[in-house]
């Protein structure tokens, strides 16, 4: 009977992280454990299958061989060999089989893995991003077990030397005339075995935990910026260095301002009379309202630049500008008197539209030329 795919056994994808694989294993191991299913042969077989899949997929060397060659890559009996002692053939065949069996090591036990890096997505308002602030972040992570100080062994005990590999972390596997090294299947390449595991972390040396960090967000950050906090990732295996935490910044859209680099943009409505006669209008900035002088005969869509009213660069002392686009609004809900005044004003423009409407002049001249060209 052929073996099932190890990823299928654990119910995880081929891109699953080691943490996801461990979670799946713990859940299935509890489900099929013989103590919970006394006398159930099917559950016992499933438990062994789950255990084998876990041992392969959490060992870097075996996982690499399995991903490349399937079950044949991790079968110790393939080629009539097996595990055993003897001379160290790693120097001779390490370069040949290194890629297959995760080689490159000239003997010696596998180093405990550095902790995984973590990513935290932080959403900020535009005001927070521009001014900077300190944020309290709650981070779910794997922390070193405080009951065993990350060793995985119960207090008062310590890991013992593996009897299979004699502390080397590797064993010989024979392939016909060849012999190659791979991680010891008993200790998973560590060279030591925990016979009396810690009750709190169950020999893992790490426990799931949430921690709170106070993170300073510098002024001027923008969407896509990343803040690295060294050593604040997951704890490493059995005392290995921790990973890092990366805070990924995104900035929410603002109701008034749009940001482009260090510059801010906004649209400011102005009345018809203000655009024609000129005057001062109030313009919003992130520091409060300021007055902007509008010259007479301002056309809708004109852009005004207010220097130094943008965003301070997070990488230098440069400060961007605020660009205000004025948009002339057509008056609504007019009373009869106001309508009458507008009609009188319109009458005064009769025959003088070119003089008072420069854009209209250009438009109608263009229309006239279009029809002339069409009929020529």
Swiss-Prot record:
Binds 2 Zn(2+) ions per monomer. It comes from Shewanella halifaxensis (strain HAW-EB4). Belongs to the DnaJ family. Zn(2+) 2 binds at residues 162, 165, 184, 187. Participates actively in the response to hyperosmotic and heat shock by preventing the aggregation of stress-denatured proteins and by disaggregating proteins, also in an autonomous, DnaK-independent fashion. Unfolded proteins bind initially to DnaJ; upon interaction with the DnaJ-bound protein, DnaK hydrolyzes its bound ATP, resulting in the formation of a stable complex. GrpE releases ADP from DnaK; ATP binding to DnaK triggers the release of the substrate protein, thus completing the reaction cycle. CXXCXGXG motif repeats lie at residues 145-152, 162-169, 184-191, 198-205. It comes from the Bacteria. The J domain is necessary and sufficient to stimulate DnaK ATPase activity. Zinc center 1 plays an important role in the autonomous, DnaK-independent chaperone activity of DnaJ. Zinc center 2 is essential for interaction with DnaK and for DnaJ activity. A zinc finger (CR-type) spans 132-210. Zn(2+) 1 binds at residues 145, 148, 198, 201. PANTHER family: CHAPERONE PROTEIN DNAJ, DNAJ HOMOLOG 1, MITOCHONDRIAL-RELATED. Residues 5-70 form the J domain. The keyword Chaperone applies. GO terms for cellular component: cytoplasm. GO terms for molecular function: ATP binding; heat shock protein binding; unfolded protein binding; zinc ion binding. This is Chaperone protein DnaJ. Homodimer. Its cofactor is Zn(2+). The lineage of its organism: Bacteria, Pseudomonadati, Pseudomonadota, Gammaproteobacteria, Alteromonadales. GO terms for biological process: chaperone cofactor-dependent protein refolding; DNA replication; protein refolding; response to heat.
């Amino acid at each position: 009977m052929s073996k099932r795919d190890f990823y299928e056994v654990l119910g995880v994808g081929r891109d699953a992280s080691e943490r996801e694989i461990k979670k799946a294993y713990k859940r299935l191991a509890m489900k099929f454990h013989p103590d919970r299913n006394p006398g159930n042969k099917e559950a016992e077989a499933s438990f062994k299958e789950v255990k084998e899949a876990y041992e392969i997929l959490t060992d870097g060397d075996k996982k690499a061989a399995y991903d490349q060659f399937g079950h044949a890559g991790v079968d110790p009996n393939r080629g009539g060999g097996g595990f055993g002692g003897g001379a160290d053939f790693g120097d001779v065949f390490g370069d040949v089989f290194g890629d297959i069996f995760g080689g490159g090591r000239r003997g010696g036990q596998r180093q405990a893995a550095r902790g995984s890096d973590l990513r935290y997505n932080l959403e900020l308002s535009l005001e927070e991003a521009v001014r900077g602030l300190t944020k309290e972040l709650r981070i779910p992570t794997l922390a070193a077990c405080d009951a065993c100080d990350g060793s995985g062994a119960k207090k008062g005990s310590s890991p013992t030397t593996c009897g299979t590999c004699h502390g080397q972390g590797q064993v010989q596997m024979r392939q016909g005339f060849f012999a190659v090294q791979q991680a010891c299947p008993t200790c998973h390449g560590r060279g030591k075995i925990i016979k009396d595991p810690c009750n709190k972390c169950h020999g893992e040396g790490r426990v799931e935990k949430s921690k709170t960090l106070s993170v300073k967000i510098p002024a001027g950050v923008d969407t896509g910026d990343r803040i690295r906090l060294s050593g604040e990732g997951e704890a490493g295996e059995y005392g290995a260095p921790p990973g890092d935490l990366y805070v990924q910044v995104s900035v929410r859209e603002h109701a008034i301002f749009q940001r482009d680099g260090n510059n801010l943009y906004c649209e400011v409505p102005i009345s018809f009379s203000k655009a024609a006669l000129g005057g001062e209008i109030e313009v919003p900035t992130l520091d409060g309202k300021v007055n902007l002088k509008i010259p007479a005969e301002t056309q809708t869509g004109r852009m005004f630049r207010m220097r130094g009213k943008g965003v301070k660069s997070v990488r230098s002392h440069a400060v961007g500008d605020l660009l205000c686009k004025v948009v002339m609004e057509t008056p609504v809900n007019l009373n009869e008197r106001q309508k009458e005044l507008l009609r009188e004003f319109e009458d005064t423009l009769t025959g003088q539209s070119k003089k008072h409407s420069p854009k209209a002049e250009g438009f109608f001249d263009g229309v006239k030329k279009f029809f002339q060209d069409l009929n020529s």
